[in-house]
Amino acid sequence: WMEQGVTIFRVDNPHTKPILFWEWVIAEIHKTNPDVIFLAEAFTRPKIMSSLAKVGFTQSYTYFTWRVSKPEIMEYMNELVNGLSRNYFRPNFWPNTPDILPFHLQNQTENIFILRYALAATLSSSCGIYGPAYEFYENTPIAGREEYFNSEKYEVRFYDWKKTNRMTDI
């Protein structure tokens, strides 16, 4: 993949593999490709997320998705900015993911989608959205769950890429 110009790898659930394996793989790749970025898609205990960062994951998913109230966001930011991991853990803020439609986005208007993106973009130096689901404000969940009703994981979806709205204009 790197020979084809790919320089960013999102690793799904790296915390389910041995930490020493990732330390070895990342070090080997960085010997010849030091600019390659590894994004840990790891929603796990903070200690394990820190361990992944220490062995070379350049960025990591975070719990931003579930920090909703002002006190929750302030406490989490304080943890990231002032905690011990601030020297090696690089948070990547995602308002949603391919798997997760958080409760606070469910059945909501575009305003909350834009607000959450603005928070992600200004509170972290690295943010992402899972679009087009996010870009087009898909907000219908499976009842009682944090999952999309019409998830792209289970069906082929087609989108009108000429369609614009406040999010696509950002």
Predicted regions mapped to residue ranges:
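Active-site and adjacent substrate-binding regions of carbohydrate-active enzymes
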Residues: W1-I170
